Structure formats: C-alpha cells, structure tokens
C-alpha cells in the first residue's frame, strides 16, 4: 500500500453537499482495512519524534482518524464538537463561513495549561474548522504542536488561514 493508492481510493462526488462542490469521499479508505490501517500508520509516522500529550479532532470525520491515531500513539483524545453535543461545561469559538457563522465547542477541562496538542482532521479545505479547533485548544492554555491532515485541497489555500501553525498533510489534491 502507498499514499498514492490511498489518494486514488478517495473518490470525488460532484455537487455534494451542494451544487458546484466536488466532495472528497474517504469512505472507500475507511471500509478497506488495509488502507485504513495504512493511513493511520502514515499519520503516526509523520508525527515521529514529536512530544505531545493529546490529540484533538473536530467532528465528524476528524474523529475517524483522530481517535485511532491517539490510540496508536498512546495519548489521550479530545473531541471538538458542534454546539450542544458535549455534556459537561464547554468553551465555544465562533468562526466565519462563506455564508454566515458556525461554532465549535470543547470541554473546559479537556486540555490543561501547557499541554501539547496535535489536531487531526481528514481534509484541509478552507481551514476554518481547524482554525477554530486550534483557538479552542489555545484558549484552554494548550499549545498546538502541529496540525495533521490525511489530505489537502491545495487550491483552496487553507494553509493561509493556519499561518503560524506547523501543518502536515499526506496527500495533496
């Protein structure tokens, strides 16, 4: 298995979730045990030598890679969720969308002062969701060690929004 093979497995769905969008569907990677395992192993390899305490990931697809990666690396996992989905006291961060705003939440006790956190997601597009996730970690006193993606849509320039963070992406479209 290679990253090029993983890239070829990510199919493009036209006009989803709305007209004009070419959605990158990772479900073929997830359903193939060898491809999914290889993806997690390559994410783990990309983080070799780094010292961090936690992995945080936004819902929903970030969970699919963040939780198994945390398990593989022996660190804790912190979910970053849409409003009203976490049961304990939360901290919220509102961010801009193309049309309007959205927000994400994290438990107030999820990250301790000075803890180093890697943020994981399946795809870097515009960077808005990951930027909000990073700001939540920082508001709690955490340090964003790096942000890692399985894939990146380079033509959307999401890296610009994440300027100042150490960005890793394994597959580029």
Swiss-Prot record:
Biological processes per GO annotation: adenine salvage; AMP salvage; purine ribonucleoside salvage
EC number, UniProt record: 2.4.2.7
Pathway: Purine metabolism; AMP biosynthesis via salvage pathway; AMP from adenine: step 1/1
Name recorded for this polypeptide: Adenine phosphoribosyltransferase
Family: Belongs to the purine/pyrimidine phosphoribosyltransferase family.
Entry's localization field: Cytoplasm
Catalytic activity: AMP + diphosphate = 5-phospho-alpha-D-ribose 1-diphosphate + adenine
Molecular-function annotations in GO: adenine binding; adenine phosphoribosyltransferase activity; AMP binding
Organism: Thermoanaerobacter sp. (strain X514)
Primary location recorded for the protein, binned into one broad class: cytoplasm
PANTHER family xref list: ADENINE PHOSPHORIBOSYLTRANSFERASE
Function: Catalyzes a salvage reaction resulting in the formation of AMP, that is energically less costly than de novo synthesis.
Oligomeric and partner information: Homodimer.
Pfam assignment, any one: Pribosyltran
Record's signal peptide: none
Record key words, sorted: Cytoplasm, Glycosyltransferase, Purine salvage, Transferase
Gene Ontology CC: cytoplasm
């Amino acid at each position: 298995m290679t990253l090029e093979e993983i890239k070829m497995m990510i199919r493009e769905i036209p006009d989803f979730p709305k007209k004009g969008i070419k959605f990158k569907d990772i479900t073929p990677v997830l359903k193939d045990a060898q491809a999914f395992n290889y993806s997690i192993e390559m994410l783990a390899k990309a983080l070799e030598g780094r010292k961090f305490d936690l992995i945080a990931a936004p819902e929903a697809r970030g969970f699919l890679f963040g939780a198994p990666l945390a398990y593989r690396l022996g660190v804790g996992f912190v979910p970053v969720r849409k409003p009203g989905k976490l049961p304990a006291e939360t901290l919220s961060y509102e961010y801009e969308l193309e049309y309007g705003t959205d927000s994400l939440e994290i438990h107030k006790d999820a990250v301790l002062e000075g803890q180093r956190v890697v943020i994981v997601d399946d795809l870097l597009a515009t960077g808005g969701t990951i930027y909000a996730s990073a700001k939540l970690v920082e508001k709690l006193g955490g340090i964003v060690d790096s942000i890692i993606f399985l894939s990146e849509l380079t033509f959307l320039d999401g890296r610009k929004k994440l300027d100042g963070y150490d960005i890793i992406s394994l597959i580029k479209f």
